[in-house]
């Protein structure tokens, strides 16, 4: 995530010339670098055999890029809701839209690659694992935002609230399921369970 945040910022700046995204992505990347330095144990996870696959790297990379873009869209949404009391400009909403388009596209690629990986590992493309369920809810939420923007382009604040709700769903999809009791021992995506299972196997 520390690598893909500034990369997302550079790509966004190169495409739409939003200068602020460079500073935002760099600062947020430094936050994650500090986490990696001072809490290295969070990465000390042993993957179960099914997850030790060539699909692991591209699947995670695509998702991290998607999360970086959608995170940037969320920061912009928060800024517009809290600091733009006199009206939101069309080009400001266009920024949120463009970031969401790219983020959702990469999220879709992540879901598709995950489905292919699941088929190879477990024999099915989709099993409504808790992680998959939250991923589907997140995907549909961002899709609903896009359709809402197309249908009601002037309803800026309602759209931005929807963007914040979508990001909350994304947080549950990303790491929130690790703490859901219903996911423990059930979800192959639950890192806490995966790590414990690997320890028991050793």
Question: Language-model segments: what does each one mean?
Answer:
Residues 193-202:
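Single conserved hydrophobic/aromatic residue that forms the stacking wall/gate
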Residues 49-56, 122-133:
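Non-cytosolic membrane-interface motifs at loop->transmembrane helix junctions
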Residues 1-44, 60-83, 92-120, 130-188:
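Hydrophobic cores of alpha-helical transmembrane segments in multi-pass integral membrane proteins
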Residues 46, 50-53, 87-91:
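Juxtamembrane loop-helix boundary motifs flanking transmembrane segments in multi-pass membrane proteins
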């Amino acid at each position: 995530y520390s690598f893909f945040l500034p990369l997302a910022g550079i790509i966004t700046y190169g495409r739409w010339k939003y200068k602020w995204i460079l500073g935002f992505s760099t600062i947020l990347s430094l936050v994650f670098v500090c986490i990696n330095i001072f809490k290295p144990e969070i990465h000390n996870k042993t993957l179960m055999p099914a997850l030790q696959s060539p699909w692991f790297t591209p699947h995670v990379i695509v998702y991290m890029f998607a999360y970086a873009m959608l995170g940037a869209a969320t920061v912009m949404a928060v800024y517009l809701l809290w600091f733009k009391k006199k009206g939101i400009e069309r080009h400001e909403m266009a920024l949120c839209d463009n970031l969401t388009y790219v983020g959702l596209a990469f999220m879709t690629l992540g879901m598709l690659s995950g489905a292919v990986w699941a088929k190879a590992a477990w024999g099915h493309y989709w099993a409504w694992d808790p992680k998959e369920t939250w991923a589907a809810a997140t995907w549909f939420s961002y899709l609903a935002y896009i359709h809402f923007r197309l249908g009601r382009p002037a309803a800026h604040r309602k759209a931005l609230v929807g963007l914040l709700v979508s990001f909350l769903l994304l947080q549950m999809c990303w790491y929130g399921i690790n703490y859901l009791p219903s996911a423990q021992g059930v979800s192959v995506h639950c890192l806490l369970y995966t790590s414990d299972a690997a320890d028991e196997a050793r």
